[in-house]
Amino acid sequence: MKGRYNLMIYVGIDIAKLNHFASAISSDGEILMEPFKFTNDADGFQLLTSKLESLALQDDSLIIGLESTAHYGDNLVRYLVASYFKVCVLNPIKTSSMRKNNIRKTKTDKVDTYIIAKTLMMQDSYRFVSFYDLDLMDLKQLGRFRQKTIKQRTRLKIQLDRKSVV
């Protein structure tokens, strides 16, 4: 087990609407966790974290990567950051170029988890999601909600004006 403490663990998570897939590889390329499916809810998140906690030798030896995808992964990212995991949201363009380098051109959720983990492993530096980033996500969401509400209010005022003219 000499040198085992320098081992980094890279977790790739493929995000989808209802279910996500995750796998883990070591910095020497060994598959530590075969791809498995978990639900996009608290039960699924707890399943994931229990598997991750059994892998990590040290708190800083595990890095989680996932592609930036709409809003489907937001709750998972919040959960993982709140659980003090290091989470890195990857640009899909980077994973796409890694996918092109893959010998097998198949695109499945299970294969994508490895590609995401390998993309993470090849990074020179990481930008981890912080609590500040989560606050910014909330602020953006509130801004979009405000814009939508103002638009709806304007539409209703116009309808009200039309009805009062008649």
Predicted segments with their positions:
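Anion (oxyanion) recognition and catalysis
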Residues: V81
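Short glycine-rich, Thr/Ser-proximal phosphate-binding strand/loop in the N-terminal lobe
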Residues: K17-D43
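Long, charge-rich intrinsically disordered scaffolds of nucleic-acid metabolism proteins
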Residues: C88-V166
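Gly/Thr-rich phosphate-binding beta-strand-loop-beta motif of the actin/hexokinase/Hsp70
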Residues: Y5-S26, I116, T149
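Short, glycine/acidic-enriched loop or turn micro-motifs at the edges of active sites
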Residues: K17, A70, K94
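Short, basic/hydrophobic alpha-helical segments
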Residues: D43-S61
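Short, well-ordered alpha-helical microsegments
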Residues: Y72-V77
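Short glycine-rich phosphate-binding loop at a beta-alpha junction
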Residues: D60-T69
